[in-house]
Each structure stands twice: as structure tokens, then as C-alpha cells.
């Protein structure tokens, strides 16, 4: 991660597959005070960056549909800019699952720009392969698979809105193993050994944010020791990650249905980290999905 102090001009390259939210992210950056240039032909990139300019932060939208798109050119440009005093180049990658990208194109009835007629999945796969080196090089990766436009705005503002030097940001989430592991997660803890409230009729329809469910889960004799050891592990590792320059860490707790045990554990862990002064956000994947299905 390059220097992003207030004395350095931020230059953010923004890319990602079609349908992942690149245009929305650029709009947020423009609202945050960035000069935004979208779809700049890569053959003009060097000349554009050589032009003297103000200290206003700059966001460059990189569209893989451009005829001269090249991951090598972009990576080389980032490397070149990194060595220039007073500049802070970064790569923001908007990621999204293939399934959700396909659904978004189906819902909008748009044709994927790289796909043969009526075969959008082929275009999505091709585009993701093209973007692979940039995803691996990304300084900030935002997975928009389960984000709405408001949540995406909050994520982009968190990383790039004015406010000085970034701190390590911690994301804590719960999930269901039935639906698979979350994408781009750093640490995963399995809560399925804890007593399951699902088998208690009066608790089945509730979730882990409810006091009765929390009381039931935390009453398990193994809960306190498990929670304490997880807290201790995170509090040991977070300063080390921060000191190494890591700016984002994702911690996930899973159980069978993602409704009870993992939710309680995620809530408790996020609260503990916040009490220690860490910047924490929390989300419950399955609860959010259910809420979206009901609206």
C-alpha cells in the first residue's frame, strides 16, 4: 500500500467486471472531491499523467471493454507512479460473483459487452480472466456481490473520502455453511459445535440478534472460552496486520443456517473489538439475504 497521507496526491485506478459497480464507485469518488476521468484510452495514459496538475485527487475509470485494454500497461503505470514523490497511486477493484453478475445483466436486459448474443456467461468469464492480474494487484478490493448501491457508497466513502490517513478497518460477518464461505475473507471460525437454538421451537424463528437467542447460545459451557480465545487471537493479530500496512481485514463466523450461533458470535466479537478501539463494521449475510428477499 502506498503513502496516502494528506501531502500526497491520490491517484486511484478504478476497475472491475461490467456490472460490479465501477460507474457507481466513480460517482461516489466525484462526490468526495476527486477529479474523475472515465474510459481514458490507455495509449493516452502516460501523456495524461505527465501533465502538471493541482493536488486534487484523481480517479481513473479503467474499462476492460476498451480496445486497447492491457493489464500490463496499468500495472506498469502503477509501478511508475509509486516511485514519484508526492503521488499516492492505488488500485480499487470492484469484484462480484459470476452468478450475481449474470443475474444483474438478466434483470437489466443489457447485453454483456464481451459476450456473443444470448450468451452473457461467456462474456463474464472472459472478462474475469482478463482482469485477474489487476484483482491480484488491487490495493482495495470491494466485493459488491451482496451490496446495494447505498452500501457500496458507504464502502467507497470509507476508503477514499477525505479524513486523513486510513486505519485498519475490520469487517465481521456471519454466514451459513450451506451457502458456502464468504468471498475474500481472511479468518474463518466454525461455530457449529455450539448448542443449536434451531432445535428449540420457540427460538427457531428468531435470530442471533434477539436477546433470547443470545442468552441460549452464550449459556453453552464452551461459549465463553471459545469467545475469549477468538478475541485474544484477533487482538494479537490486528496490530501486526496494521503495522505491516494491511488496511482491511475480514473475519467470518459460520454455522449451519447462519441465523443463530454465528450471528451471536459475530455480534459479541465485533463489540469486543470496538471496545478495544478498532474500527469495526458488521453484517449478517443470511439475515441480509432474507431481508432482501422479503422486500
From Swiss-Prot:
The uppermost taxa in this organism's lineage are: Bacteria, Pseudomonadati, Pseudomonadota, Alphaproteobacteria, Rhodobacterales
- HAMAP family xref list: RapZ_like (MF_00636)
Alphabetized PANTHER family for the sequence: RNASE ADAPTER PROTEIN RAPZ
The protein, known as: Nucleotide-binding protein RD1_1380
Q: Describe the function of this protein.
A: Displays ATPase and GTPase activities.
| GO molecular function ontology, one term from the record | ATP binding
What are the disulphide bonds in this sequence?
Answer: none
Keyword set, alphabetical order: ATP-binding, GTP-binding, Nucleotide-binding
Q: Where does ATP bind?
A: 16-23
Task: Report the Pfam families cross-referenced here.
Answer: PapZ_C, RapZ-like_N
Keyword GTP-binding (UniProt): yes
NCBIfam families registered for this protein in UniProt:
PRK05416.1
Q: Where does GTP bind?
A: 63-66
State the family it belongs to.
Answer: Belongs to the RapZ-like family.
Q: Which residues form a coiled coil?
A: none
Instruction: Name the InterPro entries on file.
Output: P-loop_NTPase, RapZ-like, RapZ-like_N, RapZ_C
The domain of life is Bacteria
| Originating organism | Roseobacter denitrificans (strain ATCC 33942 / OCh 114) (Erythrobacter sp. (strain OCh 114))
Amino acid at each position: 500500500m502506498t503513502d496516502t497521507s494528506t501531502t500526497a496526491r491520490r491517484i486511484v485506478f478504478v476497475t472491475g467486471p461490467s456490472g460490479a459497480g465501477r460507474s457507481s464507485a466513480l460517482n461516489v469518488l466525484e462526490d468526495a472531491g476527486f477529479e474523475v476521468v472515465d474510459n481514458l484510452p490507455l495509449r493516452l495514459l502516460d501523456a495524461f499523467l505527465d501533465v502538471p496538475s493541482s493536488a486534487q485527487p484523481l480517479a481513473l475509470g479503467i474499462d476492460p471493454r476498451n480496445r486497447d485494454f492491457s493489464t500490463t500497461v496499468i500495472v506498469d503505470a502503477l509501478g511508475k507512479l509509486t516511485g514519484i514523490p508526492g503521488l499516492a497511486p492505488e488500485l480499487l477493484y470492484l469484484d462480484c460473483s459470476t452468478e450475481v453478475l449474470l443475474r444483474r445483466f438478466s434483470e437489466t436486459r443489457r447485453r454483456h459487452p464481451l459476450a456473443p448474443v444470448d450468451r452473457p456467461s461467456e462474456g463474464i468469464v472472459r472478462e474475469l480472466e482478463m482482469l485477474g492480474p489487476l484483482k491480484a494487484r488491487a490495493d482495495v478490493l470491494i466485493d459488491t456481490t451482496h451490496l446495494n448501491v447505498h452500501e457500496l457508497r458507504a464502502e467507497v466513502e470509507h476508503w477514499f473520502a477525505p479524513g486523513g490517513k486510513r486505519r485498519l478497518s475490520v469487517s465481521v460477518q456471519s454466514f451459513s455453511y450451506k451457502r458456502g464461505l464468504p468471498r475474500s475473507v481472511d479468518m474463518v471460525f466454525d461455530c457449529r459445535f455450539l448448542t443449536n437454538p434451531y432445535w428449540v421451537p420457540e427460538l427457531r424463528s428468531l435470530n442471533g440478534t434477539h436477546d433470547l437467542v443470545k442468552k441460549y447460545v452464550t449459556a453453552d459451557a464452551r461459549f465463553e472460552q471459545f469467545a475469549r480465545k477468538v478475541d485474544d487471537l484477533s487482538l494479537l493479530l490486528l496490530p501486526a496486520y496494521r503495522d505491516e500496512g494491511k488496511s482491511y481485514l475480514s473475519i467470518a463466523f459460520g454455522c449451519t443456517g447462519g441465523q443463530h450461533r454465528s450471528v451471536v458470535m459475530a455480534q459479541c466479537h465485533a463489540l469486543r473489538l470496538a471496545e478495544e478501539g478498532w474500527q469495526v463494521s458488521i453484517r449478517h449475510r443470511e439475515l441480509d439475504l432474507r431481508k432482501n428477499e422479503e422486500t
